[in-house]
C-alpha cells in the first residue's frame, strides 16, 4: 500500500510540475501576442498620423492657392 501511495504522489507531483510549465509557456505566448498587437496598433496610429498630416498639407496648399488666385483676379 505504501508503494502505491508513493507512486501516486510521485505521479501527481510530476503532473503538477508539467502543468505549471505549460501554464508558464502559455502566459509567455499570450504576452508575446499582446506585444505584437501593441506594435501593430502603434504602426496603424503612425500611418494615420502621417496620412492626416499629408492631407492637411495638401488642403492647406490648395486653400492658399485658391486665395492667391482670388487675390490675383481681384487685382486685374
Swiss-Prot record:
Subcellular localization(s) per the UniProt record: Secreted
Compositional bias annotation for Acidic residues: 30-41
Disordered: region residues: 25-45
InterPro entries linked to this entry: Dermaseptin_dom, Frog_antimicrobial_propeptide, FSAP
Signal peptide: 1-22
UniProt KW keywords: Amidation, Amphibian defense peptide, Antimicrobial, Cleavage on pair of basic residues, Immunity, Innate immunity, Secreted, Signal
GO BP term, example: innate immune response
Main location: secreted
Top-level lineage group: Eukaryota
Propeptide: 23-45, 75-76
Pfam families in alphabetical order: DD_K, FSAP_sig_propep
Tissue: Expressed by the skin glands.
Modified residues (Glutamine amide): 73
Gene Ontology, cellular component aspect: extracellular region
Family, as annotated: Belongs to the frog skin active peptide (FSAP) family. Dermaseptin subfamily.
Protein purpose: Antimicrobial peptide.
Name used for this protein in its record: Dermaseptin-S7
Amino acid at each position: 500500500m505504501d508503494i502505491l501511495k508513493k507512486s501516486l504522489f510521485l505521479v501527481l507531483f510530476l503532473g503538477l510540475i508539467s502543468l505549471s510549465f505549460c501554464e508558464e509557456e502559455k502566459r509567455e505566448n499570450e504576452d508575446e501576442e499582446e506585444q505584437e498587437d501593441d506594435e501593430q496598433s502603434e504602426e496603424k496610429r503612425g500611418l494615420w498620423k502621417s496620412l492626416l498630416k499629408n492631407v492637411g498639407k495638401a488642403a492647406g496648399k490648395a486653400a492658399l492657392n485658391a486665395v492667391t488666385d482670388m487675390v490675383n483676379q481681384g487685382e486685374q
